[in-house]
A protein has these predicted regions:
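Conserved ATP-driven motor cores of ASCE-family P-loop NTPases powering translocation/secretion/packaging/pilus
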Residues: 176-207
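P-loop NTPase motor domains
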Residues: 1-184
C-alpha cells in the first residue's frame, strides 16, 4: 500500500503541469519502469536520491529502501497486480479523465443519476467500480467539509443493488456511519447478511 501511495504521489506531483498524465495507468508504468533491474540496481533508488527534501513522495519511497530486496520485490509486484486492469486500452481511456464534475453537481444540486452497470457473470471489472464509488464518496465528503460546513445541501443516495455479490468498497464502514451526517445515504439490497460477512467481515457488516 505504501509503495502504491508513494508512486501515485510521485506521478501526480511530477506532472503538475500535465494533468493528462496524472492517472493510474501512468502509475503502473512508473512502477514497472522504476522497479526493473538496470545494471544491478533499481532506477527507483536513483530517483529517490534525486528528489528534493520537500518532495511529498520522498519519505514514502525512502521507506522501501529499509526493506530487504526480496521484501521490496513483493511490494512492487503487489502494486503492479493491483493496477494491471488499467493497462487495458479501453479502461485507460475511460479512467484517465472524468466526463463529469462531481463538485459542480454538488454545487448545482440538480437531480441526477449515475449508473454503474456490471455483468453479473464476470467480476473482472468490479474493483474498478468499487474504486469509483470510493472516489465519489471521498469527493462528497471533502465538499461537505470544505464548502458546506460538514454536510452537502442535497443528499446523495447510493442504491447498492446486490451489494453482497460486489467487491469490497474500502471505506464502506465510514460511509455507512459517518457518511450519513455528511449527506451520504446507502440503500443496500442483499440476499443475506452472510454475504456481507464474507466480503467485509462480521464486525463491519453488523454496522
Amino acid at each position: 500500500a505504501a509503495t502504491l501511495a508513494a508512486s501515485i504521489m510521485a506521478v501526480c506531483y511530477d506532472n503538475q503541469d500535465h494533468p493528462e498524465y496524472q492517472n493510474l495507468t501512468n502509475v503502473f508504468y512508473f512502477i514497472t519502469e522504476m522497479c526493473s533491474d538496470y545494471r544491478g540496481a533499481l532506477p527507483l533508488q536513483f530517483y529517490i536520491d534525486s528528489l528534493p527534501e520537500e518532495h511529498p513522495a520522498k519519505i514514502l519511497l525512502a521507506a522501501t529502501k529499509v526493506a530487504a530486496m526480496r521484501t521490496r520485490s513483493s511490494f512492487y509486484v503487489s502494486a503492479i497486480m493491483t493496477l494491471k486492469l488499467l493497462t487495458i486500452p479501453a479502461i485507460n481511456q475511460m479512467s484517465n479523465k472524468s466526463d463529469f464534475d462531481i463538485g459542480k453537481m454538488i454545487d448545482e444540486g440538480k437531480k441526477i443519476i449515475i449508473y454503474l452497470c456490471l455483468p453479473a457473470r464476470d467480476k473482472t471489472y468490479f474493483p474498478l467500480a468499487s474504486l469509483v464509488l470510493r472516489q465519489l464518496s471521498d469527493l462528497i465528503d471533502y465538499a461537505a467539509d470544505e464548502k458546506y460546513g460538514g454536510r452537502v445541501p442535497v443528499r446523495w443516495n447510493f442504491v447498492d443493488d446486490e451489494l453482497g455479490n460486489f467487491t469490497k468498497i474500502t471505506n464502506m464502514r465510514q460511509q455507512t456511519s459517518f457518511g450519513t451526517g455528511k449527506g451520504i445515504r446507502h440503500f443496500m439490497f442483499i440476499q443475506s447478511y452472510a454475504q456481507l460477512d464474507d466480503v467485509y467481515g462480521e464486525k463491519v457488516s453488523q454496522i
